[in-house]
């Protein structure tokens, strides 16, 4: 039976999520978004209203298609008594051995999640990202396009691993970090902030 899905966020990321929903054989009911002057339809589905209108669609499942982790968290905590949809593209490889994916998470095309990995709620595992064995990703983490996490990595809540970044095995990254594009993390990161370069170092504020 097809699931009926309402997507929160009529944006580029929302288009991708809509495509994943359709590829999984489910149906997009429409989008909720607080932006002004939106068209009546987006990505082939209707704009249903503002986010606060979600209660009209309680028979559907919901997914937040917004890249910013703090905004995803705010919306997830605001919406009460909803069923969260987990979007996994059919081309993604998700191990069946002791692997868990939290509600509201998006797993995009050609992503790989290996055995023993634990993915939190409302995460984004972007196109072609690799999450190796026994990783732990806390809620609201975003692993960007082509990023690679070696085995037994722990990523704290709301941390963003940038496009093409790599994390060595057995590393821990604390919450609320941004790891820049192409950065290579070879040591534990214990202080929130932005980290760039090879090896990754904290970017000092000016």
What are these regions (language model features)?
Residues 12, 70-71, 100:
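Short alpha-helical
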Residues 25-28, 44, 59, 81, ...:
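A generic structural signal for alpha->beta connector loops
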Residues 9, 62, 84, 132-133:
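Generic structural signal for conserved hydrophobic packing positions in ordered secondary structure
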Residues 1-3, 176, 206:
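Short, low-complexity, intrinsically disordered N-terminal peptides in bacterial proteins
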Residues 1-56, 105:
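Hydrophobic, well-ordered beta-alpha structural blocks that scaffold small-molecule cofactor pockets
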Residues 18-20, 74-78, 119-120, 190-191:
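Short amphipathic alpha-helical segments
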Residues 88-203:
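Structural signal for interior beta-strand "rungs" in well-ordered beta-sheet cores
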């Amino acid at each position: 039976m097809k699931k009926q899905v309402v997507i929160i966020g009529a944006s580029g990321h929302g288009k991708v999520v809509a495509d994943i929903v359709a590829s999984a054989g489910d149906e997009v009911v429409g989008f909720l978004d607080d932006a002004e002057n939106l068209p009546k339809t987006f990505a082939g589905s209707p704009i249903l209203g503002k986010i606060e209108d979600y209660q009209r669609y309680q028979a559907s499942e919901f997914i937040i298609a917004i890249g910013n982790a703090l905004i995803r968290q705010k919306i997830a905590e605001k919406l009460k008594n909803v069923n969260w949809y987990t979007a996994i593209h059919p081309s993604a490889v998700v191990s069946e051995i002791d692997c868990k994916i939290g509600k509201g998470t998006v797993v995009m095309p050609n992503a790989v999640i290996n055995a023993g990995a634990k993915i939190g709620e409302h995460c984004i595992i972007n196109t072609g990202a690799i999450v190796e064995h026994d990783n732990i990703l806390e809620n609201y983490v975003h692993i960007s396009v082509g990023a690679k996490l070696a085995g037994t990595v722990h990523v704290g809540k709301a941390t963003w691993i940038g496009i093409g970044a790599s994390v060595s095995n057995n590393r821990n990254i604390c919450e609320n970090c941004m790891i820049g594009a192409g950065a290579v993390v070879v040591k534990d990161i214990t202080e929130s902030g932005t980290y760039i370069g090879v090896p990754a170092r904290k970017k000092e504020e000016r």
